[in-house]
UniProtKB/Swiss-Prot annotation:
Alphabetical GO biological process terms: lipid A biosynthetic process
GO CC annotations on file: membrane
Residues given in the record as Zn(2+) binding sites: H79, H236, D240
Source species of the chain: Rickettsia conorii (strain ATCC VR-613 / Malish 7)
InterPro entries: Ribosomal_Su5_D2-typ_SF, UDP-acyl_GlcNac_deAcase, UDP-acyl_GlcNac_deAcase_C, UDP-acyl_N-AcGlcN_deAcase_N
Protein family according to the UniProt entry: Belongs to the LpxC family.
Pathway: Glycolipid biosynthesis; lipid IV(A) biosynthesis; lipid IV(A) from (3R)-3-hydroxytetradecanoyl-[acyl-carrier-protein] and UDP-N-acetyl-alpha-D-glucosamine: step 2/6
EC number per UniProt: 3.5.1.108
GO molecular function, one term: metal ion binding
Annotated catalytic residues: H263
UniProt protein name: UDP-3-O-acyl-N-acetylglucosamine deacetylase
EC category: hydrolase
UniProt keyword list: Hydrolase, Lipid A biosynthesis, Lipid biosynthesis, Lipid metabolism, Metal-binding, Zinc
Cofactor requirement: Zn(2+)
């Protein structure tokens, strides 16, 4: 299997869910073995680019933020990263004229649509995979995420909320190709009781029912059209997991299991994997 990039550039406009700032984002093709690179076009400096890598993750509060050594940052990258992973895009340049990726409708679907409109180009380099060789586990209080060796990627994810609108939900995922049909359109969510506090901290400035599922104090879904799936919440957490894990630069070949995962836990798993060179190896499809 070969690496892929886009056939042509594709752009969108939107607001950041936390910053509330309107930005333009363009996904551009690039050469083999580049990976995913973000460029802040509103900063006129050679220091305006950031590699979408787990070691550049600088904040995981409610979203995933990456930054470089010059303190240039881009936040809320996970939905776009999930779309790139789900569409098997290995190499792309992301140009953005602001500090936050547009939230769009709160899911990955608009980014999947953009990539499908641009088309995909196979490149003259083998696609790489991260194959897990030993059991690795990260735990924070009652939250946990672990991966074990496997010949295929599988994910089993459970979430557990006290809110009756969500409750306990579980989802198993076996096929990357089904991401665009079954996971990509699952939206982010939040509780109305938290909005004032978040806004006082400079967060959720762009949040609305157009880009998030809102849940009130009576555990009622406030969006006029309701949910897209009965288990949309766990689907979105799975989406976040894929986006965060793609900051390792490849698809992971492992059996992954998570309980009450978070952006912080997702990132910690990657750090734990790469801290032990005997726990993984990079392979091509012919070596799987």
């Amino acid at each position: 299997m070969q690496q892929s990039t886009l056939l042509k550039p594709v752009s969108c406009y939107g607001i950041g869910v936390h910053s509330g700032k309107r930005t333009q984002l363009t996904i551009e093709p690039t050469k083999e073995n580049t990976g995913i690179i973000f460029i802040r076009t509103d900063i006129s400096s050679e220091n305006n680019y950031i590699e979408a890598s787990y070691f550049n993750v600088s904040d995981t509060l409610l979203s995933t933020t990456i930054s470089n050594d010059h303190k240039v940052q881009i936040s809320t990258i996970e939905h776009l990263m999930a779309a790139l992973w789900g569409c098997s895009i290995d190499n792309a340049i992301i140009k953005i004229d602001g500090p936050e990726v547009p939230i769009m409708d709160g899911s990955s679907k608009p980014f999947v649509f953009m990539i499908e409109c641009a088309g995909k180009k196979l490149q003259n380099a083998p696609k790489k995979y991260l194959k897990i060789l030993k059991d690795i586990k990260v735990v924070h209080k009652d939250c946990e995420l672990y991966c074990t060796p496997s010949d295929h990627m599988t994910v089993d994810l459970t979430i557990d909320f006290s809110s009756k609108a969500i409750g306990r939900q579980n989802l198993s995922f076996r096929d990357q190709e089904s991401f665009t049909k079954n996971i990509a359109d699952a939206r982010t969510f939040g509780f109305i009781r938290d909005v004032d506090y978040l806004k006082s901290k400079g967060l959720a400035q762009g949040a609305s029912f157009e880009n998030a599922i809102g849940i009130d104090e009576q555990d009622k879904i406030l969006n006029p059209n309701g949910l897209r799936y009965e288990d949309e919440f766990v689907r979105h957490k799975l989406l976040d997991l894929f986006g965060d894990l793609y900051t390792n630069g490849t698809s992971i070949v492992s059996a992954i299991k998570g309980y009450k995962t978070s952006h912080a836990l997702n990132n910690e798993l990657l750090h734990r994997i790469f801290s032990d060179t005997t726990s993984y190896k990079f392979v091509t499809s012919s070596e799987l």
